[in-house]
């Protein structure tokens, strides 16, 4: 997403009205203060108070404290938890796609390969390595011989 504004809509402060594809509802401009990026952020941050991320706040706070970051605002901790959850989800999804591609190649090369729709996948290093490499993380299997 290099070069994009990540969905943030900027309005001209001089009263011009380029909405970049977003309608303001009534068109009268009465809802103008609700469409500013700061109001979107404050709405999102207030919604984080009710949201429970998959990574508990205590775990996120622990690792933030280990890194030297301290915050008493649980919304900040939950925002970081949500970002970590999204990052991990993207990596796991990429690993799943690598696994599907690998198993598809194995079943097409094998005559009479199974084509079950409800197949279970196991996360292996073989699939995780290329997914992490896409994100610039290099991992290797541990050599068990000494």
Curated annotation (Swiss-Prot):
Family from the record: Belongs to the TAF10 family.
GO cellular component: cytoplasm; nucleus; SAGA complex; transcription factor TFIID complex
Organism expressing this protein natively: Drosophila melanogaster (Fruit fly)
Region (Disordered): 16-43
GO molecular function, one term: promoter-specific chromatin binding
Reported tissue expression: At embryonic stage 9, expression is seen in the mesodermal layer and midgut primordia. The mesoderm-specific expression persists in later stages of development and at its highest level is detected in midgut, hindgut, and differentiating somatic muscle fibers. Coexpressed with Taf10 in the lateral epidermis and anal plate.
Cited function: TFIID is a multimeric protein complex that plays a central role in mediating promoter responses to various activators and repressors.
Pfam families per record: TAF10 (PF03540)
Gene: Taf10b
The entry's keywords: Cytoplasm, Nucleus, Transcription, Transcription regulation
Gene Ontology BP terms: transcription initiation at RNA polymerase II promoter
Name by which UniProt lists this protein: Transcription initiation factor TFIID subunit 10b
UniProt xrefs under CDD domains: HFD_TAF10
Self-association state and partner proteins as the record states: Belongs to the TFIID complex which is composed of TATA binding protein (Tbp) and a number of TBP-associated factors (TAFs). The N-terminus interacts with the histone fold of Taf8.
Localization per record: Cytoplasm; Nucleus
InterPro entries the record matches: TAF10
PANTHER family: TRANSCRIPTION INITIATION FACTOR TFIID SUBUNIT 10
